[in-house]
Amino acid sequence: MAENKITGKVHFLQCLKQTIAYLTYLNRRIKHDRLTIAAGSMAYVTLLSLVPMITVVLAALSAFPVFAGLGELLQNFVIENFVPAAGEVVKTYLNEFVANAGKMTAVGIGALFVVAMMLMSSIDHALNYIWRVHEKRRPVISFSIYWMVLTLGPILVGSSIAVSSYLGSLNLLNSEAVNGLFQQTLRALPVIMSSSAFLGLYLLVPNLKVKFSHALLGALVASSLFELSKKGFALYISNFPSYQVIYGALAVIPILFVWVYLCWCIVLLGAEITASLGERKQWQLSSGEPITSKDCDVKVMAKNEQEKSSEAENNKGTK
């Protein structure tokens, strides 16, 4: 009984020591990578690339007749679930910008595509820097990955929304039990999509093999923080409308920038968590030698105690 208690305490201390070592290493890593500065840079690039990205996405959807009319549905879904405040204003401005972009010539549309590619390249560079990857992919491979994300990404999202809408129209969903389950699934869809997006980002973008369990944990942490920040940010904007008071009709600009900056902080934090989980040896050594299995052996501990007591008795006898 006493041995079990000692074993439990040792394991608890071991887990506590490992957790403290990991959090210390993670904090040091975040400071070294200047996460907040990198997030600000990515937010700036994102705002510059936002309209070109949406234009390319809508163009990819319109190229397939089966997805006709899904562009606006997808845009509404993204704004309602991923932009917590000033969603209608953002939607109005984006529609105007995209409509103006649609009037451009082929050269202008090509320039928009290049700008959208620059955003993908910035994401690639930021995440590979976090993973300490110095070897770059060949340009052909990078272009293929960016093209796949820009084309297949919206198609897959549009397909999921189309399937959800189709299932919602079936007579099979008339029963209360099935309908309730379907409604719960729809409510969880933004969380599932954000988790899947983070997981794919942490698995595919770094130019090295990332453990699925590490990427999954980082994605779950990032998606949880994303949902909490979405609700918290919306609550702050609605209860403390300082931006509207100061900027008036232009308040949507700083609101959108702050939100995009916060999103990139979460994305990069999830990447730091995922990358640091794969550096176990480094964060173990950063806090000294880890507790080994020998330290957890109760018999060894008891033997050490006996040796100490016998040495104390021998010293007394010598005196």
Curated annotation (Swiss-Prot):
Keywords: Cell inner membrane, Cell membrane, Membrane, Transmembrane, Transmembrane helix. It is found in: Cell inner membrane. The chain crosses the membrane at residues 50-70, 107-127, 143-163, 188-208, 215-235, 249-269. Its main location: membrane. It is a multi-pass membrane protein. The keyword Transit peptide does not apply. Signal peptide: none annotated. The keyword Transmembrane applies. GO terms for cellular component: plasma membrane. Belongs to the UPF0761 family. NCBIfam families: PRK01637.1, yihY_not_rbn. This is UPF0761 membrane protein PBPRA3489.
